[in-house]
Design a protein with these regions (language model features):
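Structured catalytic-domain cores with a bias toward divalent-metal coordination
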Residues: 1-355
Length: 355
């Protein structure tokens, strides 16, 4: 896989809608690098932006964009759709590669300094500029979770307008202060929501993206006081491997890895995990080779997980997000995110302040 990120930006307008291939796969083949679609709306004084395919293996936003662009309807406002990383999606097997093999994660480079001359940093700057230059009234970034999961939103700003955005797609969200260099962390002077549409291979995820995108582009007013519909999970922790620790997923402890999580771990994306729930196995050494980083950069793993005779158990009642069994992601990015639910959160705060 020696394909490089293209430097040129491809712009399309309404005239291209009739030329779009009938399938999403055919549409992908028509794109050659960063691709921007500008569609004029009924109200041409306002702009809304959709970014998608930052990760090449997360197709729901792309599928929804293809569906909407082909239906030839006029949006309520001007719409800019940015297809961020077609190169990764086109790399065989198609729609299976998060990023190009020799490149790093695009959604970790949006905070890179202007002097960073890596191709991927340049692509991130091009995308940021493409969003900022139209002065949008709202921005949606569409993703999929790596494992099977219901849809949820991720936001940084706890305000009604941003919650209204999320409510167009889902009624569940994470309010986070964690920073990883994502596009969501950038300042566009507009409400911004990341939508995780669900698992990348689930038809329901593509429907979430289509339904939400339709609402986002067709409504004259999207800030209509629907924020009370949204269930908020606050202060996620990012659970990662420590150092060069290894991980596997199995019904039994693996002798070839430091950490073994349950083979059915993805089910915890759909339900709370109770204190005392068995999670997996670990090496019996002195240190647990996992960390749970909070928004202040502090490791909270000892408040989340108990070890007992080489077994791992939940120490708190938690909601897990983005659990997946893809070894490359679990090893190089993170295992999952977790929010501690209210009853357990109160106990954690007592421990933190020494009560």
């Amino acid at each position: 896989m020696n394909q490089l990120l293209k430097v040129d930006i491809n712009y399309f307008d309404e005239s291209f809608r009739s030329q779009i291939a009938p399938t999403a796969l055919g549409f992908l083949q028509q794109l050659d690098g960063l691709s921007i679609f500008d569609i004029k709306g009924v109200d041409q004084s306002r702009n809304r932006v959709i970014t998608t395919l930052i990760h090449g293996n997360e197709p729901s936003g792309f599928i929804a964009s293809h569906w909407w662009l082909r239906n030839d309807k006029i949006p309520a406002t001007n719409i800019r759709i940015i297809i961020c990383n077609p190169e990764a999606a086109k790399t065989k097997p198609k729609f299976s590669n998060r990023y190009l093999a020799h490149e790093k994660d695009l959604n970790r480079f949006f905070s890179a300094c202007d002097s960073d001359m890596l191709e991927i940093a340049l692509r991130a700057r091009q995308i940021k500029q493409a969003v900022a230059e139209v002065k949008p009234e709202a921005v949606i970034d569409l993703h999929n979770t790596s494992g099977s999961s219901p849809a949820f939103g991720v936001i940084l700003a706890d305000d009604e307008r941003t919650l209204d955005l999320v409510s167009l797609f889902t009624n569940k969200l994470i309010l986070t202060g964690l920073t990883v260099g994502s596009i969501m962390e950038q300042s566009f002077n507009a409400p911004f929501a990341t939508i995780e549409c669900g698992g990348s291979n689930e038809i329901s995820s593509h429907q979430v993206a289509k339904d939400g995108l339709h609402e986002f582009v067709s409504r004259e007013f999207i800030f209509d006081n629907h924020s009370d519909r949204v269930e908020i999970h606050r202060h996620p922790l990012r659970i990662e491997l420590v150092g060069d620790a290894s991980i596997g997923f199995s019904h039994d402890r693996l002798p070839t890895t430091d950490i073994t999580l349950r083979a059915d771990a993805e089910k915890f994306n759909r339900q709370c995990i109770s204190a005392g729930e068995f999670i997996g196995w670990c090496d019996t050494g002195e240190l647990l080779l996992l960390q749970a980083i909070d928004e202040q950069g502090v490791d909270q793993i000892n408040h989340l997980i108990d070890r007992n005779n080489g077994c791992l158990f939940a120490k708190q009642t938690m909601q897990l997000f983005m659990v997946n069994t893809i070894l490359e992601i679990a090893t190089n990015d993170c295992l999952f995110y977790a929010t501690v639910e209210k009853s357990s959160l109160n106990e954690m705060e007592k421990i933190r302040i020494g009560i």
